[in-house]
C-alpha cells in the first residue's frame, strides 16, 4: 500500500475509475448481446431499436477512451451488416 498521501489518493481514484469503466464496458457488451439475440430471432423492429442503443453505447465508450474509436466503428459496421441481412430477408 502507498505511504504518500497523493499516492493513496491516486490509488483510490484509480480503483473508482476501474469499477466505473468495468460497468460501462459490461453495459456495452450487454447491449451488443441483446441486439445479436434479436437478430437471431429475426425481430426486425426490436433489432433496430437495439442497434441504436448498442451504437450509442459503443460511441460513448469510444469517446470516453474505453475502447479505440476504430474498434467502435468496426463493431458498429458489423452490427449494421447483421441488421441489414435480416431486413433484406
UniProtKB/Swiss-Prot annotation:
Transmembrane domains' residue ranges: none
InterPro entries: Ribosomal_bS20, Ribosomal_bS20_sf
Record's keyword terms, sorted: Ribonucleoprotein, Ribosomal protein, RNA-binding, rRNA-binding
Cited Gene3D superfamilies: Ribosomal protein S20 (1.20.58.110)
Alphabetical GO biological process terms: translation
Bias (Basic residues): 7-20
Keyword Ribosomal protein appears in the UniProt entry: yes
An example Gene Ontology CC term for this record: small ribosomal subunit
Membership in a protein family: Belongs to the bacterial ribosomal protein bS20 family.
Entry function: Binds directly to 16S ribosomal RNA.
Record's protein name: Small ribosomal subunit protein bS20
Organism: Geobacillus thermodenitrificans (strain NG80-2)
